[in-house]
Amino acid sequence: VLMDEPLGALDKNLRESMQYEIKHIHESIGVTVVYVTHDQSEALTMSNRIAVFNDGKVQQLSNPSELYEKPVNSFVAEFIGENNTFNGEVSDISGDECKVKLSNAEIIASAISVKSKGEKTTVSLRPERALIEPSEKMDNMFSGKIEEVIYHGDHTRVRINLLGNPEFILKVPNST
């Protein structure tokens, strides 16, 4: 079954409800469904496997959690979900981690698609992975200036000028 943007004209609440309904029907009848969408959240919700295309070529084919947590390149990382990025140069590689030298700091990052020291690279960090004033010491602790705070109901979006990136975004869960 091919479904090409079937929920595009629906309002947000109905669209989300229909996503779950379609997923449950698909699972109960056991047929293969190719679901075409430009809505990344919808793709993550509806799919067992997701293919991300760029210029007609598959960039990554994997399950939703692997696609979101371990994108194979910067295109996939930026296409699926929000990202904060820093450009730098790999200064050290040790196992599955590397150090990336920025113009004003050094970041410890996962060594995804990193081949050698001296290589130019982009570090990506999801807004929900960053913390404001963590309770304990950890890697990659930097000071920044809060530029904007916007309440979104389930979370607060905080824009910070951090390490020369004036558009660094954090999503802070709101407590009950």
Tell me what each language-model feature is.
Residues 1-75:
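ABC ATPase nucleotide-binding domains
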